[in-house]
Curated annotation (Swiss-Prot):
The keyword tRNA processing does not apply. It is found in: Cytoplasm; Preautophagosomal structure membrane; Membrane. The keyword tRNA processing does not apply. It comes from Saccharomyces cerevisiae (strain ATCC 204508 / S288c) (Baker's yeast). Its main location: cytoplasm. One of its GO terms (cellular component) is phagophore assembly site. Residues 144-213, 272-302 form a coiled coil. Residues 381-428, 434-453 are annotated as: Disordered. Belongs to the ATG23 family. Transmembrane segments: none annotated. This is Autophagy-related protein 23. Keywords: Autophagy, Coiled coil, Cytoplasm, Membrane, Protein transport, Transport. Forms a complex with ATG9 and ATG27. Present with 538 molecules/cell in log phase SD medium.
C-alpha cells in the first residue's frame, strides 16, 4: 500500500471515530438505545486498534514514512550527482567550442622570422635601364603608333647600331630575369596551394573529430536530461521553464538563432530546474520528518488511549456482569440499592482514576460518558433508597438500565447506528481489525501490495 493510501485510510478512521464518540454519548443517555451500546463500544475499540496498526505501519523501522524519506534522500543524491556530471560536461563542451573566424590575428600570434620569404625583382633594373636608354615615349608605353613609318625612320636614324644592340641585350636580360623570377614565384605558389590543400583536408578531419567529441558530450547531456525528467516525474515536479515544441517550431528557431544561443538557453533552464527540484525534495523531506515525529508521538498517545479505553470497558463490563449475576441469583431478581450503589461507586472511582491519568480529549470524553451514566444511576438509587426509608411508594423517574437484554422487548431505538464503513470489519471474539497482520508483514518485506481490510 502506498503512503498516500495509508494516510487517507487513517483520516477516514479518525472521522468515523469522531462520529462514534457522539453516538456513544447518545446511546448511553437513551434507554431505548441500550442494545447499540455494545456495538458502538466494539467499533470504537476496532478504530483504536486500527490507528495503532496504521501508526506502526508508518513509523516502524521499515515504515512507509521512513521508506519515503529514504527514497527522497536517494533522489536528492541522484540529483546532485546528475547536476555535477552535467556541469562538468558543459564545461568540457565549452572547451571544445570553435569560435567564429576573424580577420584579425590572435593576440598570441608570433611572426616566425625564419619563415619569411623575400621576393626579388632583378629584372626591373635591366628594364629601367632600357627605358632610360630609349626613352619612355619611344616604347609601347607611349600612345604613339609604332606603325608610323616616319617615326620609326626617325628613331632608327637617331640610334646607332651599337646602341640598339645594347638596348636589345638589356631587354633580353630583363626578360630572362623576369622569367626566372616568375618560375620561382609559380613554384612558391604551387607550394602554397599544396600547403593550403593539406590545411583544408586537416581542417575537415579535425573539425570532424571535434564535432564527434561534442556529439558524444551532447549524447551524455541528453541522457542526463532524460534521467532528470524521470526524477521530475518521481517527485511530482513540473518545470514551468520546459515547454515541448513542435518540429516546425524547432526548425524555425534553428534557422533564426545560433546554436550557441540555443545551448546557453538550455544550460540556463537546466540550472534553474535543478535549484527548484532540490528545494522541492528538501521541503518534502522536512515535511515527512515532521510527520514522522508527529506519528511517533501519536503512536504513544493512541496506545495509551486504547489501554485506558480497554481498562474502562473491562471495569464497566465487570460491573455489568456482577449485577447480572446478582440479579439472577437473587430470589426476587432485586438487588438492595445500597449494595448496588456501592458496586457502582467503586467503578466510578476507578474511572475517575483513569481520567486523572489521561489528558487526551478522546479518552476523557469516552470515559466521562461511561462515568456520567453510572453517576446518574447512583443518584437514582440514592433517591430510591431515601424514598423507601421514608415509606414512600413513589417509583424512580426512570428504570435503572444496566444494559441487560430483555426477550420480547418491543422498544424501538430512536438512535440510528451508522453502517460499519468498509475500512472496519467487526467480528466476534476476537474482533477483526481493519489493518490485518498480513499487511504489516508484507510491509516489513517491502512488498506492501494489499489493501487495508
Amino acid at each position: 500500500m502506498e503512503l498516500n493510501q495509508v494516510l487517507e485510510k487513517k483520516e477516514q478512521i479518525l472521522q468515523y471515530l469522531g462520529t462514534l464518540v457522539g453516538l456513544h454519548e447518545k446511546a448511553l443517555s437513551d434507554v431505548n438505545s441500550a442494545s447499540q451500546v455494545t456495538s458502538i463500544r466494539k467499533d470504537i475499540t476496532i478504530c483504536l486498534n486500527d490507528l495503532c496498526r496504521i501508526n506502526d505501519l508508518l513509523v516502524s523501522h521499515d515504515g512507509l514514512l521512513k521508506r519515503e524519506i529514504g527514497s527522497l534522500l536517494r533522489d536528492k543524491q541522484e540529483l546532485l550527482e546528475l547536476n555535477e556530471r552535467e556541469q562538468l560536461l558543459w564545461k568540457e563542451r565549452k572547451s571544445w567550442h570553435i569560435k567564429q573566424e576573424t580577420d584579425a590575428a590572435p593576440a598570441d600570434y608570433v611572426i616566425d622570422k625564419d619563415a619569411i620569404i623575400t621576393i626579388s625583382s632583378h629584372h626591373r633594373t635591366s628594364l629601367n635601364k632600357y627605358i632610360e636608354s630609349v626613352g619612355a615615349e619611344n616604347t609601347i608605353l607611349s600612345n604613339t603608333d609604332d606603325s608610323d613609318a616616319m617615326i620609326e625612320e626617325v628613331q632608327n636614324a637617331e640610334s646607332s647600331a651599337d646602341q640598339m644592340i645594347r638596348n636589345y641585350k638589356l631587354l633580353q636580360l630583363s626578360h630572362k630575369q623576369a622569367k626566372s623570377e616568375i618560375i620561382r614565384l609559380e613554384t612558391l605558389l604551387r607550394d602554397f596551394k599544396k600547403d593550403n590543400k593539406f590545411i583544408e583536408e586537416e581542417l575537415k578531419r579535425q573539425s570532424g573529430r571535434i564535432r564527434s567529441e561534442m556529439g558524444n558530450i551532447d549524447f551524455h547531456l541528453s541522457k542526463i536530461e532524460e534521467s532528470k525528467h524521470q526524477l521530475m516525474k518521481r517527485i511530482g515536479f513540473e518545470s514551468p521553464l520546459t515547454q515541448e515544441k513542435s518540429l516546425s517550431e524547432k526548425i524555425f528557431n534553428l534557422r533564426l538563432s545560433s546554436a550557441d544561443e540555443d545551448y546557453n538557453e538550455r544550460q540556463t533552464i537546466n540550472m534553474k530546474n535543478f535549484v527548484h527540484m532540490k528545494d522541492l525534495i528538501e521541503l518534502k523531506i522536512e515535511d515527512l520528518q515532521e510527520q514522522l515525529m508527529r506519528n511517533k508521538n501519536e503512536s504513544s498517545t493512541v496506545l495509551t488511549q486504547r489501554e485506558l479505553w480497554l481498562d474502562c470497558q473491562k471495569k464497566v463490563g465487570d460491573l455489568e456482569s456482577k449485577l447480572i449475576t446478582k440479579l439472577r441469583s437473587s430470589s426476587n431478581s432485586k438487588i438492595p440499592p445500597n449494595e448496588m450503589s456501592e458496586m457502582i461507586n467503586s467503578t466510578i472511582q476507578y474511572l475517575n482514576n483513569l481520567l486523572d491519568s489521561s489528558d487526551e480529549k478522546l479518552t476523557t470524553t469516552l470515559i466521562s460518558n461511561e462515568r456520567d451514566v453510572l453517576s446518574k444511576a447512583c443518584e437514582e438509587l440514592h433517591s430510591e433508597s431515601t424514598t423507601a426509608q421514608d415509606g414512600s411508594s413513589a417509583l424512580p423517574s426512570k428504570p435503572i438500565d444496566i444494559h441487560k437484554s430483555h426477550k420480547g422487548s418491543n422498544a424501538s431505538s430512536n438512535l440510528k447506528q451508522p453502517s460499519t464503513p468498509s475500512f472496519l470489519v467487526a467480528s466476534k471474539s476476537p474482533p477483526k481489525i481493519g489493518i490485518s497482520e498480513s499487511v504489516v508483514n508484507a510491509n516489513k518485506n517491502d512488498a506492501i501490495s494489499k489493501k487495508v481490510e
